């Protein structure tokens, strides 16, 4: 999740921060949307990586190259700007977990009448 105060509350949790750091150390997939990428930034996980977040939180992405893209994938880290990018964010996660095909899955879910 992202947004406030959710992101602030997640970052305040030692359990959450320890789990995120362990996942990063293990090379597992990390994904955050909206303001939540700032957690990765504050934990030092974005140094030398490309990342995006909700406008106004860019300075919190310590050491990252902020892209401003709707969704940015760099290695095992996926970040997204906000709720408007949620479908693309999900597709990027599917791509990582399935080895591709996320956009095809997204296309199948869309209503042709829209």
What feature does the model see in each segment?
Residues 1-114:
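Active-site-adjacent pocket-lining segments in enzyme domains
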């Amino acid at each position: 999740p992202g947004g406030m105060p959710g992101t602030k509350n997640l970052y305040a949790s030692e359990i959450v921060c320890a789990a995120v750091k362990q996942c990063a150390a293990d090379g597992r997939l990390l994904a955050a949307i909206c303001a939540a990428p700032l957690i990765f930034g504050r934990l030092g996980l974005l140094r030398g990586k490309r990342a995006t977040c909700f406008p106004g939180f860019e300075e919190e992405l310590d050491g990252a190259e902020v892209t401003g893209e709707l969704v940015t994938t760099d290695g095992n880290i996926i970040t997204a700007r906000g709720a408007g990018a949620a479908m693309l964010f999900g597709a990027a996660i599917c791509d990582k977990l399935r080895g591709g095909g996320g956009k095809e899955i997204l296309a199948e879910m869309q209503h042709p009448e829209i």
